[in-house]
Each structure stands twice: as structure tokens, then as C-alpha cells.
Amino acid sequence: MNTVREPSKTVLIVEKQANYTQLLVKQVMFAGLRPLVAVTGEGGLRKALEFHPNLVLLELDLTDMNGLEFIALMKEHPRLQKIPIIAMSIFSYLKNGALYGGCEDFLKKPVKMIELMTHIRRYLRQRLKYKSPDREP
């Protein structure tokens, strides 16, 4: 009998750009992880509360709130404060604010997928396979 194993770890992707979200979802799934997607900060907070992901990938430039506000709300909430957050942005000047605000890491976009998987592996403490299903952005 064949059984399909469910992914054991969940990654919440909070990203407003659909094409970048698709790329991140592919990489997360390829690594055997379960992706959750939100396109707004408010949606991301709702999903974080509902599903309690193991990690959050956060675009800092959101449509409904500043990514730094999202970080603060996550870190203030007792159920969410220990969830690691990897912030991403095309603006490298946001790095210090993100790290000071409580992010575990910051990646400058466009992110190389092998670099992203290295960072995800670090925070999930799980050995992940990496073989790009697509070309790097």
C-alpha cells in the first residue's frame, strides 16, 4: 500500500507579488515543506494565528501595513513571538530595522533560491534537499 507523507513543517509566505510567491511556493514544496500564502500583512497574521507555521518568509513592502509593523505584531503576540521570520526586500537599507525588530534574518531580493533554502534549513533545523525545479530568478 502506498502512503503519501504530509509535509511536517509549514512555511508562511507573506508576499504581494504573485510571480515571486509562485517561485517561493515551488521551492518550499520541493523541499518537502508545506507552504501557506498571504498577500497582505493582515492575512499573514490571520494565517499565522490559525496554522502556527514553523517559519515566516516576509516581504517587507506590503500593501496594507509596513513589514516592520507585521514583525512587531508577531513578536508581541504570545502565540506567535517565537516563530522565526526571514525578511526579504529589494531595499537593503531595511535590513537593520528588520533585524532590530526581531527578524532572525534578512535577504536582499532577488534572492537566490539555494541561499533561501540554506536560511530556511538553518531556522527549521531540518536537512532539506535542494535541487532547483526552475532556473534562478
Residue ranges and their predicted role:
Residues 40-43, 66-69:
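Acidic catalytic/metal-coordinating carboxylates
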Residues 51-62:
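Active-site beta3 strand of CheY-like receiver
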Residues 69, 90-108, 115-118, 122, ...:
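Alpha4 helix (beta4-alpha4-beta5 surface) of REC/receiver domains from two-component response regulators
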